[in-house]
């Protein structure tokens, strides 16, 4: 215990430490920067729709996406650009009413007759004279006006077809409770 008493008897030496903090004074000599924006505020939307653009979704609004814009197809008597038509594409809906130009593509690119769309024809008289027959021998498309070549109206693509909507009943549609009956289950 003497060691504890000796420690208590010794006077504690004060520890000295100094912290010096430099002080700075800043004087602002420049004026505050002012940012000025130029240009008028836009009034409304920047998209201007043509008068022939139709609301294709039936939601009361028009959008700028391609799938939501419907342009009415032009009539036969109206002029149209050849570059905007899709007659060069080879889809099955276009080939249903096409006159015979696709046959040449099929023969040269197909290399053989697959039976689908193949047209079998003969070089004999089809007007009923000299024992000729009055019907088509082919399994392909039949055309009544072989002498006349009429230009067909281009069929609309998926972006040009107007969707058919079911009429709304005034509500949000039939609920499960209406279709299930009074018991609540079928």
From Swiss-Prot:
Residues 138-151 have a biased composition (Basic residues). It comes from the Eukaryota. GO terms for molecular function: protein phosphatase 1 binding; protein serine/threonine phosphatase inhibitor activity. The keyword Lyase does not apply. Pfam families: PPI_Ypi1. Keywords: Nucleus. Residues 122-137 have a biased composition (Basic and acidic residues). Residues 82-94 have a biased composition (Low complexity). GO terms for cellular component: nucleus. Its main location: nucleus. It is found in: Nucleus. Residues 1-186 are annotated as: Disordered. Regulator of type 1 phosphatases which maintains protein phosphatase activity under strict control. Belongs to the YPI1 family. This is Type 1 phosphatases regulator ypi-1.
């Amino acid at each position: 215990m003497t060691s504890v008493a000796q420690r208590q008897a010794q006077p504690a030496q004060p520890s000295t430490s100094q912290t010096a903090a430099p002080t700075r004074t800043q004087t602002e000599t420049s004026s505050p920067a002012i940012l000025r924006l130029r240009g008028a505020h836009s009034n409304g939307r920047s998209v201007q729709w043509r008068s022939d653009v139709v609301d294709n979704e039936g939601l009361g609004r028009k959008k700028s996406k391609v799938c939501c814009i419907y342009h009415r197809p032009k009539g036969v008597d109206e002029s149209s650009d050849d570059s905007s038509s899709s007659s060069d594409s080879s889809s099955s809906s276009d080939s249903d009413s096409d006159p015979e130009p696709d046959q040449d593509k099929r023969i040269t690119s197909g290399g053989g007759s697959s039976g689908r769309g193949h047209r079998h024809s003969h070089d004999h008289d089809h007007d009923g004279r000299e024992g000729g027959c009055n019907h088509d021998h082919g399994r392909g498309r039949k055309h009544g006006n072989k002498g006349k070549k009429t230009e067909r109206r281009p069929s609309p693509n998926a972006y040009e077809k107007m969707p058919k909507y079911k009429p709304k009943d005034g509500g949000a549609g039939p609920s499960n409770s209406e279709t299930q009956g009074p018991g609540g289950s079928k």
